[in-house]
Design a protein with these regions (language model features):
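Hydrophobic faces of well-ordered beta-strands that scaffold small-molecule active sites
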Residues: 119-124, 148-154, 192-198, 218-224, ...
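Active-site beta-loop-alpha junctions enriched in small/polar residues
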Residues: 126-128, 155-157, 197-203, 225-227, ...
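Active-site-adjacent beta->alpha loops and helix N-cap segments on the catalytic face
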Residues: 132-133, 160-181, 202-209, 230-238, ...
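Phosphate/diphosphate-binding loops
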Residues: 189-213, 356-359, 363, 433-437
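Active-site beta->alpha loop and helix N-cap motifs at the rims of alpha/beta catalytic domains
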Residues: 193-204, 224-228, 271-285
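Glycine-rich phosphate/ribose-binding loops and adjacent secondary-structure elements
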Residues: 266-455, 459-466
Length: 483
């Protein structure tokens, strides 16, 4: 049985003409000379490297669909009918006290200075992609009122059109980063936090120093990769001027916008977007320890580490050196990938799947514990969207796994809520929404709960944030029922 059929996918806007397809190659069994399209090979014949990336950029998120032999769906949660655990010691255990809605869903992470979460989930890294930028207000306020952490991803300062440098070439002013942080803080209530992620370019630009000195952030995140790819992050650029600007700032821009032939091709319309790529930092134990010490000297009380779906060696390094460095949270992101823009073949065919990666992580965590080493708090990531899978990851990972990082699963409610607000203003509600009502109060099932809490401030809460909060309430209830 094939785990994935190549050569055509909705994410790339490609499909096979033939009803029958060779299973290994994904090529139509009857490939016609004169075919008008459009499989991957057909489209790649004249659009080339464009066909590597899901699209259109800035309008979609994409998730790999390779179906691995084993995942969290292959195990079930085991219940019991005698007694209950977790109730206060002086509680009479019985049908009146062991009720699901009393379950405490809070968790925390951190080596010394803990961060509390109302739910054992937090967002994936929302960085310089257009999806993250355009929806930030919805995502950030939604996370804040839900009491969870939001991760501001890589390259936000470096991509800021209004970025200003000091005389040493470091960040002096970044209005976009300021907006990101201030938006979350406006509704922060003591649960969760905003942490900023750093890659090679961010380090060179002095992003850590900027967010520490101007915003007094407690936490910074180092990045060793992700589950979607083993290269640095990328976005698309729609103008030649923007491509030249970012190349000047030190980014890899392809094709090279400084070449005359490339400029001519862009101006003639042969291609309409440039690719901006980030560098992937090389890792070592000494390097991690030195960088963590440097960041603590800068002023951060917490340093977290995000690592990807690399080999067992890199995972062991992250856990061992993370322990030595007293990392506050180690996020382990498995394959396959979810993305705003990552190469589609790599998202499907690279890296260790999340379930397998967690099995390795638990083996290494127990080995560290047997050696008398403290295991850093761990979060798993990679393909999570529902409370049942989160429950399984926490149960398998107990007591080391404290939370689950959810990428698209937490972005979707923000985008749905945002669009409901837009459709209401336009008077263009689709039937899938209007069957529940014609006003925000009718459509959002818990709207009045939020209004009772925030009163006049409701006008400051965008509908996308209401969507995330509403999803979080469903997650909480479902999670309580499982517990």
């Amino acid at each position: 049985m094939n785990l994935r059929r190549p050569n055509a996918n909705e994410a790339l806007g490609t499909s096979n003409r033939s009803r029958n397809v060779a299973p290994v190659s994904g090529i139509c069994t009857r490939c016609l000379d004169g075919c008008k399209g459009q499989c991957d090979i057909w489209l790649s014949s004249f659009r080339g490297r464009e066909v590597l990336y899901p699209g259109p950029f800035g309008e979609v998120t994409a998730g790999a669909d390779k179906d691995y032999p084993i995942d969290y769906s292959h195990i079930n949660i085991q219940g019991y009918a005698q007694g209950a655990k977790g109730l206060p010691e002086d509680t009479d255990i019985g049908p009146d006290t062991a009720v699901f809605y009393s379950v405490n869903t809070e968790t925390s992470y951190g080596w010394d200075k803990k961060v509390k979460l109302r739910l054992p989930i937090f967002t994936g890294a929302l960085g310089s992609t257009d999806i993250a930028r355009k929806n930030w207000e919805h995502f950030a306020i939604g996370a804040a009122i839900s009491g969870i952490t939001i991760v501001c991803g890589e390259n936000v300062c470096g991509m800021d059109p209004d970025l200003a440098f000091d005389n040493t070439g470091k960040v002096k002013k970044s209005p976009e980063m300021d907006r990101r942080i201030e938006t979350y803080k406006k509704f922060h209530e003591g649960y969760g936090e905003i942490l900023v992620q750093m890659n090679v370019e961010d380090t060179r630009l002095g992003t850590a120093e900027y967010v520490s000195s101007k915003h007094n952030l407690d936490t910074i995140e180092l990045k060793w990769g992700q589950g979607a790819k083993c290269i640095g992050g990328e976005v698309k650029l729609k103008t030649l001027e923007r491509a030249l600007e970012l190349k000047k700032r030190g980014y890899i821009v392809l094709p090279d916008p400084t070449l005359p032939e490339v400029q001519k091709g862009f101006k003639s319309g042969s291609f309409k977007e440039f690719e901006r790529h980030s560098r992937l930092g090389f890792v070592s134990g000494d390097g991690l320890l030195e960088e963590v010490d440097r960041l603590r000297d800068v002023g951060f009380s917490r340093v977290t580490l995000k690592t990807g779906a690399y080999s067992a060696v890199e995972l062991a390094m992250a856990m061992r050196f993370g322990s030595e460095a007293k990392i506050d949270l180690l996020t382990i992101d498995g394959a396959p990938g979810g993305t705003g823009m990552s190469p589609w073949p790599m998202m499907n065919e690279w890296g260790i799947p999340t379930f397998y990666l967690q099995a390795l992580a638990m083996e290494y965590a127990n080995a560290l514990k047997k050696r008398g080493k403290r295991v850093p708090d761990i979060a798993m990531a990679g393909g999570f969207s529902s409370e049942d899978a989160v429950f399984k990851a926490l149960a398998i990972g107990s007591p080391f796994v404290k939370a689950v990082c959810m990428g698209r699963g937490l972005m979707i409610p923000g985008m749905v809520g945002k669009n409901i607000g837009v459709w209401l203003k336009e008077g263009n509600l689709p039937n899938t929404v209007s069957k529940y009502g014609k006003t925000l109060e009718e459509i959002f099932i818990s709207y009045e709960e939020l209004r009772a809490k925030y009163g006049a401030r409701m006008k400051e809460i965008p509908t996308g944030a209401i969507g995330i909060w509403t999803y979080a309430q469903r997650f909480k209830t479902g999670f309580q029922q499982l517990m």
